[in-house]
A protein has these predicted regions:
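Conserved glycine-rich beta-strand-loop-beta hairpin in the small C-terminal domain of fold type I
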Residues: 134, 149-159, 170-180
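Active-site phosphate-binding strand-loop segment of PLP-dependent enzymes
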Residues: 2-67
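Glycine/threonine-rich helix-loop capping motifs at alpha-helix boundaries
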Residues: 117-126, 169
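Helix C-cap/helix->beta junction micro-motif
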Residues: 47-48, 78, 165
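Active-site PLP attachment segment
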Residues: 74-112
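Amphipathic alpha-helix from the class-I
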Residues: 107, 127-149, 160-166
Length: 180
């Protein structure tokens, strides 16, 4: 299993560190982080004054009964120090639709983020992208469920194939996403 190395994180995080990028669920390892891990990370980042950029683009792709936990939902401290990014591109297979979203619960951090967006000339997404994103989230749930079942079937096929034909290879079953 793969776990966050908090001892190493403590060792490398000095006064120059301002930000931590979290892949939640982890990609490419396919790990759905536990509540305990996220709580510990939130406490660490809040105490160190780090902004957590939580990439949650695979959040709707938890597999085999696993449940994604949004980082900002862990605690008030997590919400106060995080910006969560997501997009419909992975879940709904619409990578050509250039659209993403950011959730910034803390008002002060949100103001800083919006100021950064304006300074770097990041405007609104094209209207077609916004419409496609809304349609995907409103109308795509049945498609998403079928896609997850298909991915789980592919993973089970790979596990079976390896077990029967190349037993030296023991694939790790992902808890989220689509990589084995």
């Amino acid at each position: 299993t793969y776990e966050m190395d908090f001892d190493n994180l403590e060792a490398v995080c000095d006064a120059h560190c301002k930000m931590l990028i979290l892949s939640n669920p982890h990609n490419p390892a396919g790990i759905v982080w536990s509540r305990e891990t996220l709580e510990k990370l939130a406490e660490f980042c809040y105490e160190k004054g780090l902004v957590v950029i939580s990439d949650e683009i695979h959040c709707d792709m938890a597999l085999f009964g696993n449940k994604h936990i949004p980082f900002a939902s862990i605690s008030e401290k997590a919400a106060a120090c995080s910006i969560t990014f997501g997009a419909p591109s992975k879940t709904f297979n619409i990578a050509g639709i250039v659209c993403s979203y950011a959730i910034v619960p803390d008002e002060n951090l949100r103001k800083r983020f919006y100021s950064w967006l304006e300074a770097n000339e990041f405007g609104a997404a094209p209207i077609f992208s916004s419409i496609a994103t809304i349609a995907a989230f409103r109308k795509g749930e049945e498609w998403r469920k079928q896609m997850l079942a298909y991915i789980e079937g592919n993973i089970e096929f790979v596990e079976s194939f390896c077990r029967e034909r190349i037993p030296q290879v023991k694939p790790l079953r992902p808890q989220a996403s689509f990589l084995v």
